[in-house]
Regions:
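Sec-dependent N-terminal signal peptides
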Residues: 7-13
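C-terminal motif of bacterial Sec signal peptides marking the signal peptidase cleavage site
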Residues: 17-20
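Non-transmembrane, membrane-proximal soluble domains of secreted or membrane proteins
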Residues: 23-39, 67-313
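Membrane-embedded alpha-helical segments of integral membrane proteins
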Residues: 33-70
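Short, intrinsically disordered, charge-biased short linear motifs at domain edges
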Residues: 6-7, 192
């Protein structure tokens, strides 16, 4: 009877623990870069599991073989010092494991830093992703539009993100598309991604940047090229242009909803690259006198799956 209750308690504990589990975004890839990283994670888990099992098996063997017995008290087990086979295993196996993981890391890093596999030769969609306290600004030079705190991307096309910050160092991360990369002031870093399938995802700042860090997230939606083109057309027909005054207001610390503009801030506040490298962003000198009022209205997204309202200015 006691055994029955023990087993029931163990089963109940397992069920309760598993009920709180959900799929990890990094292990649910939606693009080739994320798939490469997920493969490395699973490979690492598998190898570590083998190591743990082998070590536990050796531990059980040693505890069993050299347990207390009826041998004389002055008995000493044979020493293995100087045993070349044992010493080679003890030293060689860890070295081989480190070398293997090093090779895997170099190969995978080269893959995720390059144009995604299967997309070479295609023109990427260049998106400037800049951060401020505590917002994300996405500029689409090719389409001449800009969004705040949400990102629409086409599937089956390479994406080239140009990352920089108007404030403290942040880290741009869309777990289901690839790894994180730092966005810093006075310089631009480049991140190559691609989405193989449509769907909604979550992106965030993965580097602590003050009291608003926890809410420093953005919505991501991947869609077909046709739907993406329709969205761009709708934005150009309904959104108001972004101005330098309005943009400087957005750079002030605080949270905002999802905003949409025509034009980009790159026209009057270019990214810190090329001849503009080292330019100081977010200076108080840039906060010029405000003129006019800015009216906002709800953006009715053409995609029925969009749950949150986008404000067009």
């Amino acid at each position: 009877m006691r055994t029955k209750w023990v087993l029931l308690a163990i089963l109940s504990t397992i069920v309760n623990v598993l009920s709180g589990c959900k799929s990890l975004a990094v292990l649910d890839p939606k693009g080739p870069q994320a798939q490469t990283q997920a493969n490395v994670i699973w490979l690492s888990i598998a190898i570590m599991a083998v190591i743990v099992i082998v070590v536990c098996a050796i531990l059980v063997f040693v505890l069993t073989k050299y347990r207390d017995s009826k041998l004389p008290k002055d008995y000493e087990p044979p020493y293995i010092e100087g045993n070349h086979v044992v010493e080679t295993i003890i030293v060689g196996v860890p070295i081989l494991i480190v070398i293997f993981f090093s090779v895997v890391s170099v190969i995978s890093n080269n893959k995720v830093e390059a144009t995604p596999e299967g997309y070479k030769g295609q023109d990427p969609l260049v998106i400037y992703a800049s951060s401020s306290d505590w917002k994300w600004h996405f500029s689409y030079p090719e389409n001449d539009i800009e969004t705040v705190n949400y990102l629409y991307i086409p599937t089956n096309r390479p994406l080239q993100f140009k990352l920089y910050s108007f404030g403290p160092i942040t880290s741009f991360w869309i777990p289901q598309l690839g790894g994180q990369k730092y966005a810093m002031s006075n310089m631009v870093t480049t991140l190559h991604l691609a989405a193989d399938e449509s769907g909604e995802m979550m992106g965030r700042n993965a580097n602590f940047s003050g009291k608003g860090f926890a809410e420093n997230t953005f919505h991501v939606e991947a869609m077909s090229q046709d739907k993406f083109d329709e969205w761009v057309k709708e934005v150009k027909e309904t959104a108001k242009p972004i101005t330098e005054v309005r943009f400087n207001e957005l750079l002030k610390p605080g949270h905002e909803g999802q905003l949409t503009f025509t034009g980009t801030h790159l026209d009057f506040s270019p990214a810190p690259e090329g001849e503009n490298a080292g330019h100081h962003h977010g200076s108080s000198d840039s906060n010029t006198n405000s003129s006019g009022e800015h009216m906002e209205h709800d953006h009715k997204s053409s995609n029925s799956k969009e749950k949150s309202a986008h404000n067009h200015e």
